[in-house]
């Protein structure tokens, strides 16, 4: 395990973007594999669906996520902290990063980007219309579920994990989250949203 960590540390230092592209694509694909295994929609495994998830994770999300976490690393509590201890200052800075991540990236970048790009990759006759319908049906409920799952984890991530490893840690944690997103995207198991967010099923079905 130590040798794997050392090897990854070397790769992320020398080739951060390529390393994140490979690991993010693999872990997004793993999330879809898990979704299809736990909640199969048919007897036949959909390899194209897993390839779409892998493509999205590696080509779309990884470069954006890499830049986003490096940007968040530079964001701190905006008001003067001259009279507080270093510990309090660190807590305020961490809370600020989590707040920006959850109030900016999640609702306006992460969730819309996922549903939009994945709808296009499915090659529907009218992919933009499909993307709008999925966003209308799932955006708010996905966001509420996101706020149940992610803030506590991101507090840990921003407080304890070095910036170069944050996307990797998020991606590992995201295997379960990607499983959830893949299930919602393919609207075969909308009961997942109902169980987590306690909303009426009629509000989320397309």
Curated annotation (Swiss-Prot):
Q: Name one GO cellular component term.
A: mitochondrial inner membrane
Topological category with respect to the lipid bilayer: Multi-pass membrane protein
Please state where this protein is localized. Mitochondrion inner membrane
Keyword hit for Transmembrane: yes
Q: Where are the transmembrane segments?
A: 16-36, 103-123, 155-175
Matching Pfam families:
Mpv17_PMP22
Q: What keywords tag this UniProt record?
A: Membrane, Mitochondrion, Mitochondrion inner membrane, Transmembrane, Transmembrane helix
Cited InterPro entries? Mpv17_PMP22
The family classification in the record reads:
Belongs to the peroxisomal membrane protein PXMP2/4 family.
Q: What does this protein do?
A: May be involved in cellular response to stress. Required to maintain mitochondrial DNA (mtDNA) integrity and stability.
Q: What is this protein called?
A: Protein SYM1
Q: Which organism is it from?
A: Debaryomyces hansenii (strain ATCC 36239 / CBS 767 / BCRC 21394 / JCM 1990 / NBRC 0083 / IGC 2968) (Yeast)
Taxonomic lineage from the root: Eukaryota, Fungi, Dikarya, Ascomycota, Saccharomycotina
